[in-house]
Amino acid sequence: MDDLERIELSAVLDFFAAAPPDVLHAFDLAVLDLGDAAAFSIGAHPKMLLFNRVLGLEEGDAALPQIERWFASRGCTFAVSIRTGAVLEGVLDERGYRRGTAFMKFRRGVEQPPVRRSPLRTEQIREERAGDYGTVVAALFGLGSPLDRWFAALCTRARWACFAAFDESRLIGTAAAHFADTLGWLGAAGTLEDARRRGAQAALLAARIRAAGDAGVRLLATETVDRVDGIPGPSFRNVLRAGFEEAYVQQWWLPPE
């Protein structure tokens, strides 16, 4: 597991650890410790692969039967996220797994990105606006409560920095960053549909890069859906414009149906 996967796994595990007790029970959250790797699950949404996934699995298939039994016991499907070209791909293929969505992993230092003019302002979210932040994130996911309280909890959690973009007083975009020593991960970014194409995500990327530098981070990681038919999506283009470079493709593998 390299630094890009390591900080992603750190972010996901700390996100699950941040869930308030009522959210933990309402969503039936669980984590399976696999040593350097982990499986995590949201039982209330058994087909939601983002939160029913395995990260950090190394070459070999020793843990796969345990993982399969665990997700089956929870009634959830899942995805195994691994780097394209890893030996484990052959093992998964032999077990009847199939390719799902591919994500591009990106990396960069904490040098400031080019300044882009925007009519929007960005602000780090503290306790007093955490509820508003969570409400918008939940709306972007289309899940509502209690997802709002889960994301709101990150705004005051150590090793996290949550930012929002505002159109005057209206909160229209959200994004989060997780820091662990000299590594940082950027994710959970989105903009309300009626406010897109106004530079919100570019501004939020810049704000998080600055925060990462202030926190002592030296290497930043993020990921977004890979090119489709060779064409990058808006998120992919935003990340490149912010100075990230493509590292490699992370493939999601789905178990046999």
Tell what function each PLM region has.
Residues 57-121, 126-128, 222-223, 228, ...:
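Acyl-donor-binding surface of acyltransferase catalytic domains
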Residues 23-33, 75-77, 100-102, 154-164, ...:
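A short helix-loop-beta-strand connector motif used in the catalytic cores of GNAT acetyltransferases and
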Residues 60-68, 188-191, 197-214, 237, ...:
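Conserved acetyl-CoA-binding loop-helix of GNAT-fold acetyltransferases
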Residues 1-72:
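N-terminal charged segments
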Residues 143-194:
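A conserved beta-strand-loop-helix scaffold within acyl/acetyltransferase catalytic domains
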Residues 45-58, 182-193, 252:
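Conserved acetyl-CoA binding element of GNAT-fold acetyltransferases
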Residues 1-18, 55-58, 103, 112-150, ...:
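Short amphipathic alpha-helix that is part of the acyltransferase structural core
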